[in-house]
Curated annotation (Swiss-Prot):
Converts N-acetylmannosamine-6-phosphate (ManNAc-6-P) to N-acetylglucosamine-6-phosphate (GlcNAc-6-P). The lineage of its organism: Bacteria, Bacillati, Bacillota, Bacilli, Lactobacillales. The keyword Cytoplasm does not apply. Pathway: Amino-sugar metabolism; N-acetylneuraminate degradation; D-fructose 6-phosphate from N-acetylneuraminate: step 3/5. SUPFAM superfamilies: Ribulose-phoshate binding barrel. GO terms for cellular component: cytosol. It comes from Streptococcus pyogenes serotype M49 (strain NZ131). It catalyses: an N-acyl-D-glucosamine 6-phosphate = an N-acyl-D-mannosamine 6-phosphate. Keywords: Carbohydrate metabolism, Isomerase. One of its GO terms (biological process) is carbohydrate metabolic process. This is Putative N-acetylmannosamine-6-phosphate 2-epimerase.
Length: 234
């Protein structure tokens, strides 16, 4: 297992490259109760030249770590109803991820009500106090949320949840306006969400982002097949 990189070192590594999100949830075709599928996707991503992996769950991350030294952005998806945030939503999930020695922990930093009752700035501060050497990424949906996380000391701001909160911009593709605005504000942006084509990734890279995460367009074959099938119907 490689040593955790500094923010500067990681930014060098991610610059101009693609981070591939390798995830499958129960009910999806590539989900397996016994595991073993996500490391195959990660291996394919590495062979293609990916600069990092985003992965969900302790099991999947451990399996991916066994086959690659690429930096991992780790999350744990767990529902806490009736609250909506479910991506690394409490300190419990942060603790589990911190024990894995991964490069970055990503967590929901939207303004929605949280299970722990904290506001985002307080949650970020608590995590930073507990794990001062851990790089952190805020999954947000709006410019204001990104700015709050940035000002609270988060290392990276991901546009992951734009279009997935009721109050954020609803678009079929990536939220280019949000990505550009955060970059112009001096935020280290990891663009993520609805990036469907190499052309979109190139446009995003030209905005000066710190990194780009592509998931469904690479690692969700059902979604990819549906896009082709729908195109023939239109």
């Amino acid at each position: 297992m490689p040593d955790k990189p500094t923010k500067e070192k990681l930014m060098e590594q991610l610059k101009g490259g693609i981070i591939v999100s390798c995830q499958a949830l129960p009910g999806e075709p590539l989900y397996s109760e016994t595991g073993g599928v996500m490391p195959l996707l990660a291996k394919a991503a590495q062979e293609a030249g990916a600069v990092g992996i985003r992965a969900n769950s302790v099991r999947d991350i451990k399996e991916i770590q066994a086959i690659t030294d690429l930096p991992i952005i780790g999350i744990i998806k767990k529902d806490y109803p009736p609250q909506e945030p479910f991506i690394t939503a409490t300190m419990t999930e942060v603790d589990q991820l911190a024990a894995l020695n991964i490069a970055v922990i990503a967590m929901d930093c939207t303004k929605r009500d949280r299970y722990d009752g904290l506001d985002i700035a307080s949650f970020i501060r608590q995590v930073k106090e507990k794990y001062p050497n851990q790089l952190l990424m805020a999954d947000i949906s709006t410019f204001d949320e990104g700015l709050v996380a940035h000002q609270a000391g988060i290392d990276f701001v991901g546009t992951t949840l734009s279009g997935y909160t009721p109050y954020s911009r609803q678009e079929a593709g990536p939220d280019m306006a949000l990505i550009e605005a955060l970059c112009k504000a001096g935020v280290a942006v990891i663009a993520e969400g609805k990036i469907h084509s190499p052309e979109e990734a190139k446009k995003i890279n030209d905005l000066g982002v710190a990194g780009i995460v592509v998931g469904g367009a690479i690692t969700r074959p059902k979604e990819i097949a549906e896009r082709f099938i729908e195109a023939l119907k239109s």
